[in-house]
A protein has these predicted regions:
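C-terminal accessory "lid"/substrate-recognition subdomains
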Residues: 151, 159-240
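Phosphate/Mg2+-binding loops and adjacent switch elements
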Residues: 86, 90-193
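Nucleotide-state-sensitive switch-loop elements of NTP-binding domains
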Residues: 2-8, 13, 17-135
C-alpha cells in the first residue's frame, strides 16, 4: 500500500518550507514521492514553491480553492486515485491552512482508496511565535489541525525564547481544551528546534511519528467569510532610465 503523510498547520505556519526539507529527505532514502498541494486561494502558490524538489523521484499534483466542500472532496479523491496508479510509494499531502482534517480521513476510508493507501504520519506545524489572541475560528483550526498529529513541529523556534516556545505549547493545550478534546501532547511530541539543524535522524523520527485517534467538537463556519486569500507576485523594479 502507498503510505500517505499529512502536513498540517495554520496559514503561514511554515508547512511548505518544512515539506521541501521533508520530501528531499524521503527522495534521498529512495522513495518515489508525489506531493499533493491543496491551496485555499484560487492560485496555488505553494505548488510553485516546491518546484526545486521535483525530479525523477518526486512529482506534484495540485488542487486549488474556490469550490464547495463536496466538490473539493471529489477533486481530492480523483487526484489520489490517479496518483495511486502512477507507482509512487509515498504521498505527502499539504492541505490548505484552513483544512478540515476529518475530511481527509473520510476520503481515505472510501473504496478503492482504503485498499490502496495507508495513513503514515500526521505532522503538525505550529508557529513558535503564535499570537496570544486568535479569532474563535482560528483557535478551532489550531486544535483541529493538530489533534491527530503524531508530532507537533514548532516553526521559527530559532527566533523564539524558550518561554515563547512553552507559551505556544500552552496555547495549543488551551485550544484543544476549548474544542472539548481530550487530546494532550506529551513533551516528546512537540519538537522545538532550528530547522536548519534538523538531522536525518530527526526527519526519520518525524516520518515514523504516526498519528493519533482523537476528536473535537466541530465549529461550523464560512471559511471564505472568516479568511481572505491574497496572492503577492514579485514585480521587477523598472530602472529610472526606462521610465
Amino acid at each position: 500500500m502507498v503510505q500517505v503523510d499529512l502536513i498540517t498547520g495554520f496559514l503561514g505556519a511554515g508547512k511548505t518550507t518544512f515539506l521541501r526539507r521533508y520530501v528531499r529527505y524521503l527522495v534521498q532514502q529512495g522513495h518515489k514521492v508525489c506531493i499533493l498541494e491543496n491551496d485555499f486561494g484560487a492560485v496555488n502558490v505553494d505548488a510553485m514553491l516546491v518546484q526545486e524538489v521535483l525530479g525523477p523521484g518526486c512529482d506534484v499534483e495540485t488542487i486549488s480553492g474556490g469550490c464547495d466542500c463536496d466538490t473539493h472532496q471529489r477533486r481530492m479523491r480523483t487526484k489520489l486515485i490517479a496518483m495511486a496508479m502512477r507507482g509512487f510509494d509515498r504521498v505527502v499531502v499539504e492541505p490548505s491552512g484552513i483544512f478540515d482534517v476529518d475530511e481527509f480521513f473520510d476520503i481515505l476510508r472510501d473504496d478503492p482508496l482504503d485498499r490502496w493507501y495507508q495513513l503514515g504520519s500526521v505532522i503538525a506545524i505550529v508557529d513558535a511565535l503564535l499570537p496570544e489572541t486568535l479569532s474563535p475560528q482560528a483557535e478551532y483550526l489550531l486544535a483541529s489541525e493538530t489533534i491527530n498529529a503524531g508530532c507537533v513541529l514548532l516553526s521559527r523556534a530559532q527566533l523564539a525564547a524558550p518561554a515563547q516556545c512553552a507559551a505556544a505549547a500552552a496555547h495549543l493545550e488551551r485550544a484543544l481544551e476549548a474544542a472539548k478534546s481530550s487530546r494532550r501532547f506529551a513533551p516528546g511530541e512537540i519538537l522545538a528546534k532550528d530547522w536548519d539543524a534538523l538531522t536525518d535522524a530527526d526527519l526519520a523520527a518525524l516520518a515514523a511519528c504516526g498519528y493519533r485517534q482523537a476528536s473535537c467538537e466541530k465549529l461550523h463556519f464560512d471559511q471564505h467569510a472568516a479568511f481572505t486569500s491574497l496572492c503577492f507576485l514579485e514585480l521587477h523594479q523598472i530602472g529610472r532610465a526606462h521610465v
